[in-house]
């Protein structure tokens, strides 16, 4: 089995056996509202995102934001082979206010 085939098999198993849903649910449950300073984005990265990335072989670095102490940047890098093409992706860890009180009784923005 090629490394690519192994990776596809692993990803399929992770998704089909509920690992993806479990991990995503745990990430969604963390309130990282950018307007609410009591939720620390740096802690979210350190406690939730970085462990997942390190498990996949990434080197991670939190970079301070000169405009806002609360909104830091996470830089993660994984070089599998210098001869391979580079893939760049971008995301963010904060969300807008969840407005929990506006959701229907059986729904919440954090589940």
Where are each of the predicted segments found?
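Acidic/His- and Gly-rich active-site-bordering loop/insert found
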Residues: 2-111
